Amino acid sequence: MTIEEARTLIRGVEWRGSRPGLSRVRELLHRIGDPQDTLQFVHIAGTNGKGSTAAMLAAVLQAAGYTTGLFTSPFLEQFAERMQVNGQPIPDAELAAACETLQPCIAAMDDQPTEFELVTAAAMLWFQRRGCDIVVLEVGLGGRLDATNVIGAPACAVITNIGLDHTEILGDTLAQIAREKAGILKPGTRAVSYPQTAEVRAVLHETCARLGIPLTEVDADAIEPLRDSVDGQTFSYRGAVYDLPLLGRHQLRNAAVALETVAALRTRGWRIPDAAVHAGLAQVRWPARFEVLRRAPWFVLDGGHNPQCAQTVADNLARYFPGRRITLLVGVLADKDYPDLIAQLDPYAAAYIAATPLSPRALPAEELGAYLQRFGKPVTVCPDPAQAAASALAQAGEDDVICAVGSLYMAGAIRTYLRREHDENSGH
């Protein structure tokens, strides 16, 4: 099978959309020999911070010498990013080989899998073929009925920051959403949690008590920021000092989740030296999370798509770029709470550019532009995200800041454009 045929297979199931439930992915994996049963996992659910926390843990485990798989979604620039081993995305030939194994199994199924289920199965097969010692596995949506929850008890189950998102599927209270996320907790694992609201903590404590598993919660008071600039942060947690290239105070809490997860893994026999923890955190890369892509003018990229993320971006703009003129390049999905997202960011905006993310669920730039008019600031409508980035750069002064925000489905196109522009200008 060629990579084009593999992509056609994946696209062919894409139109079926998202259908919660484990029966299809369970059947598909069983038909290929249940590769997930031969692997060890750190399973991560939550509303925000899943990807950043997963990237930190994968970097630490790799630095400790383990062959480390990483499964995340969605991708930014290329599909292969969704499954990586030791920081390297799956090669085309190996993705094609995994899909070739899956194809006859899919054809034999009465109830055919969704795109996410197919990709989850392909990843499990590839991680097994690559001999992964451990896989950091990010939930796609929710937890209880997510395809990744087909695994048995993981070495550690991690719950990152829980907020209101996907309410039409997961429920419209924090407690309901927390119950869905807590569906990844199983007897025989250990649980680690971000510092949550009282409502969420109550659900996690009740679930862990019922399952008879230990729960470690990050102690937010034990996090001490020591240095903070656009070049990265230094902080201490429980007295030990760490460097972190990711920006924003929330990333210190995500890092503390990673540190508590390392401690939990150590109790289960995983050998993770302190030096590997320091090296992993210092080297971690996780694009499109308040990522500074260029300076003079500054261009910051954030894929955040809900009000919680917007508050984080607003805090970071105030912290890193006080007093500067900021243009917000915004693109959103129509089913997201974009009025609240924009309301959080508007105090920092001198002007807006409206773009259309690369998704069938996108709100058209024209509609977004019309909505933005109410804030009484200049609004430019430029549907193509790359052209919107070019337009923003053309209008910006040396000291100005452009902040692209609202959707990971827009962030990838902008990141690709800026990388190519940088390569052309530097003669690469």
Question: Where are the regions that the model predicts?
Answer:
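N-terminal leader/targeting and accessory segments in enzymes
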Residues: M1-N48, S52-T67, L76-Q78, R190-S193, ...
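ATP-dependent carboxylate-amine ligase catalytic core
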Residues: S18, L22, R26-D37, A63-G152, ...
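Nucleotide phosphate-binding/pyrophosphate-handling subdomain across enzymes
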Residues: T38, I134-L137, L145-V158, I162-G163, ...
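Acidic, Mg2+-coordinating active-site environments of NTP-dependent enzymes
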Residues: D111, L118, G131-E138, P154-R238, ...
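Short, high-confidence coil segments that cap the C-terminus of an alpha-helix
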Residues: G131-D133, G323, G397-D399
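Beta-strand->loop->alpha-helix junctions that form or flank phosphate-binding loops
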Residues: Y194-P195, T207-S229, P245-R249, V277-Q283, ...
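C-terminal helical cap/extension that packs against the catalytic core
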Residues: Y194-T216, V230-D231, W298-F299, P307, ...
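Active-site-proximal loop/hinge segments that shape catalytic or ion-binding/gating pockets
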Residues: S407
